[in-house]
Amino acid sequence: MATIPMDIVNDIFLRLPAKTLVRCRALSKPCYHLINDPDFIESHLHRVLQTGDHLMILLRGALRLYSVDLDSLDSVSDVEHPMKRGGPTEVFGSSNGLIGLSNSPTDLAVFNPSTRQIHRLPPSSIDLPDGSSTRGYVFYGLGYDSVSDDYKVVRMVQFKIDSEDELGCSFPYEVKVFSLKKNSWKRIESVASSIQLLFYFYYHLLYRRGYGVLAGNSLHWVLPRRPGLIAFNLIVRFDLALEEFEIVRFPEAVANGNVDIQMDIGVLDGCLCLMCNYDQSYVDVWMMKEYNVRDSWTKVFTVQKPKSVKSFSYMRPLVYSKDKKKVLLELNNTKLVWFDLESKKMSTLRIKDCPSSYSAELVVSSLVLGCKGDLNNIKYRKEQQAKEAREAKIMQNTKRRDDFLSKGFKLVL
């Protein structure tokens, strides 16, 4: 390795997945320092985002997390993490290779599945307001704030108040934002009035709709229509830089009559997407090509209900194929399909050892973890270091044995 110029090593390493680079740190001190260099980490992330290489799909099964490489899509691998195993650990978002993990509103973490670095967030109490009897639904979101170069977690806690609200639709919320750079929580005092109408039982409890969708330096949630309430579908966004709530305007063609449409949101090609489901018969997919510019909404494709599914209640695009001729769709939290944009045909992915029911999250391969690991998880990090040391020793002993046998073979000859 010493005979290869470091600029060439740098170029080679930029093309490798993060999991491989973690192992390459043991090659030499120069390699270790290069791979840990913040400029290299940033360049590696930039290349992955530009090329679409080394993407993986994270699957949340009933009790475990799994990953599958987008380039192969042949079988799943277990994702080991230090949060409680065999429990209700949820994945509530992804940003630049990091994912948000939740066991409870006070047991949260940011985790990099490629490097297995984790940062467990310091617990933040939930303070019940006056007149509140119980804590209700909790919304989460994870995103990168490019303005402050910081990763942030948003937690919105709904409170149920004993009142004469016959519809039971309006609730107060406690909104807190965690800064990874500061390693601290901050309460948002000014909360938009529309947030009080955000939660709807029959909508948000299904298909992970309570987890914020990241696009344009903001997290987004749908405020859905509901029976008995004069309200249209809305998209609520939380600006991670300003730490303020705003409303995202729909395309005019949709806004004029959106009462009978079920709406979902997602991200495709880095752009905010709106999925309009018409009576579970077909879904129009709109893309906001220039963020927060209403006129940039463009209908990019329509998906008819597949004959092979009984229900078409949820559909979400995840990623384009590299030739842009197909798009990977998640259907009803039960299957992944490639949708051909020209022929309009679907092909179901057959993934070995895949759970029968799951939620999917697109994750890039990166070396990012701004907090440099979890200070409260020393035991796990020591175990990982010991494991890496054992593997390195085995490789070293194997090399010595091979060298010995090679020399002995030459002596015999």
Swiss-Prot record:
Sorted UniProt keywords? Cytoplasm, Hypersensitive response, Nucleus, Plant defense, Ubl conjugation pathway
Could you tell me the superkingdom of the organism this chain comes from? Answer: Eukaryota
Q: Which PANTHER family match?
A: BNACNNG10540D PROTEIN, F-BOX PROTEIN CPR30-LIKE
Quaternary structure, from the entry: Part of a SCF (ASK-cullin-F-box) protein ligase complex. Interacts with SKP1A/ASK1, SPK1B/ASK2, ASK9, ASK10, ASK11, ASK13, ASK14, ASK16, ASK17, ASK18 and ASK19. Interacts with TRAF1B.
Report the domain remarks: The F-box is necessary for the interaction with ASK proteins.
Functionally, this protein is described as follows: Component of SCF(ASK-cullin-F-box) E3 ubiquitin ligase complexes, which may mediate the ubiquitination and subsequent proteasomal degradation of target proteins. Regulates negatively both salicylic acid (SA)-dependent and SA-independent defense signaling.
Q: What name does the UniProt record give this protein?
A: F-box protein CPR1
